[in-house]
Regions:
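Core dinuclear metal-dependent hydrolase active-site scaffold
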Residues: 7-88, 159-181
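Active-site HxH/HxHxD metal-binding segment of metal-dependent hydrolases
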Residues: 1-14, 110, 118-119
Length: 181
């Protein structure tokens, strides 16, 4: 039932936009990837993965992709190439265990990881330390959060509230958060 609804929605968005995205968004460009049916029929692994880029800053939004979906996308050379200079990764599936794929970090070395999640109520939500280590592997100091003056590697809506990245065209960015956690 979910897959049928997803396919109907997906088929409905086939109309071209009037202005190219990168011309109407002030220099922001987007590149998307997704898995096909078959082999995937679950909506999580059919998530559209979007890379938004402004200057050299790039943020990756993978939706609810799970490990099998990541592994399928990693078979594509263009996807692997796009991962290389990712600045920020939004953790897949709200940072849950089933959205984590260790092989992703062979190509993607983000300076920070963002997890959009609520209070911990499931054992599968305890991935913050794992994601933190993936940042430390390549960026030991993480990023500076202007609101708190602290170096961070993982930011979560659970702890930080809203998270805002102000980015200039040189790729420099400042992070602000709602909370002072």
């Amino acid at each position: 039932e979910d897959i049928e609804r997803y396919l109907d929605i997906h088929a409905g968005y086939v109309y071209p936009v009037d202005v190219p995205f990168d011309e109407s968004m002030g220099g922001i460009s987007v590149r998307t990837f997704w898995n096909s049916t078959p082999p995937f029929y679950d909506t999580n692994n059919l998530s559209m993965v979007a890379f938004f880029k402004y200057g050299p800053f790039k943020i990756l939004f993978p939706g609810d992709l799970e490990e099998d979906g990541w592994l399928a996308l990693l078979e594509q050379p263009a996807f692997r190439a796009e991962l290389i200079d990712t600045t920020v990764l939004v953790a897949s599936h709200h940072g849950r265990e089933n959205g984590y794929c260790r092989a992703l970090f062979d190509y993607c070395h983000p300076r920070a990881i963002v997890m959009s999640d609520k209070a911990i109520v499931h054992d599968t939500q305890g991935m913050t330390q794992t994601y933190r280590q993936r940042v430390i592997d390549h960026w030991p100091n993480g990023v500076l959060v202007a609101t708190t003056g602290k170096q961070r590697r993982v930011l979560t809506t659970r702890r930080d509230g809203w998270i805002q990245f102000n980015v200039n065209d040189r790729g420099d960015f400042t992070i602000y958060t709602e909370c002072y956690g």
